[in-house]
Amino acid sequence: MTVVVISGPPGSGKSTVAKKLASELGLRFVSAGSVFRKLAEEIGVSLLELNEMALKDPEIDLRIDRMVLEEARRGNVVIEAHLGGWVAAPYADVNVYLTAPLEERAKRIARRDGISYEEALEEILSREEVQWIRFRKLYGFDVASLEIFDLVVNTALMGPEAVVETIKRMLL
């Protein structure tokens, strides 16, 4: 019942690594970020607007947390979730945090979303500011504290293939 949780800020490579790892290990892939993006689309707001709405309505985050926990309990899954490392830690065989310098993350998001570097940078800074406030208020923890993770990787220094191989070795 393997459970790998991959957390990190926007643009850190969570989805890329999680999808590749799930594929190579024959595990299910679950993305809390995709659920959050889908919810924003469904109600017709931007990610930043949904983040701001979640400040006032904790049920938005709790709904995603319940989904992450249920998937972790089912096992045989790679979960990609900004807060997954904190929420699903008791179920994780390997708890991974990916990061990269802000400039690199902005370049990745600009490429992924087809927006300018400046727009991506502004989006990241706005989202992270709201998220940090929201997460501290709702959960009482500091997302900058990484002690709970088994592996912390700067993905600007290590590509997705190397990260996947490192995680696979940790599962042996």
Swiss-Prot record:
Task: Extract one GO molecular function annotation from the record.
Answer: ATP binding
> Keywords for this entry?
ATP-binding, Cytoplasm, Kinase, Nucleotide-binding, Transferase
Q: Which reaction does it catalyse?
A: CMP + ATP = CDP + ADP; dCMP + ATP = dCDP + ADP
Q: Subcellular localization, per the record? A: Cytoplasm
Which Gene3D superfamilies did the record assign?
Answer: P-loop containing nucleotide triphosphate hydrolases
Cite the binding residues for ATP: G8, P9, P10, G11, S12, G13, K14, S15, T16
Q: Name the family the entry cites.
A: Belongs to the cytidylate kinase family. Type 2 subfamily.
| Record protein name field | Cytidylate kinase
Instruction: Please tell me the species this chain comes from.
Output: Ignicoccus hospitalis (strain KIN4/I / DSM 18386 / JCM 14125)
Chain's gene name: cmk
